[in-house]
Amino acid sequence: MHAYTAVIERCSDTNLYVGHVPGFPGAHSQGATLDELHANLREVIAMLLGDGEPKLNTEFVGIQTVVVD
């Protein structure tokens, strides 16, 4: 079993959920619902893993809120 952290945003133009796995080339997708996005990400990641385990370019560390005056 493989586990990856996905970053998810909502596109204001299309109202779709858009997700990507940081540092995993090609691991991105979209969906009308979070469940659809999750299924789509699982599908694309499984397909990419068919080429072998990726060497991730980056490591997800976390998020921060930045306040600017």
Would you name each region that the model predicts?
Residues 9-21:
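Short aromatic-glycine-(Arg/Gly/Cys) micro-motifs in beta-strand/loop hairpins
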Residues 16-18, 29, 39:
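Short acidic, gly/pro-rich beta-turn/loop elements at beta-sheet edges
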Residues 23-26, 55:
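Generic low-complexity segments that are intrinsically disordered, proline-rich and/or Lys/Arg-biased
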Residues 25-34:
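A short, exposed loop/beta-hairpin motif centered on an aromatic-Gly-Thr core
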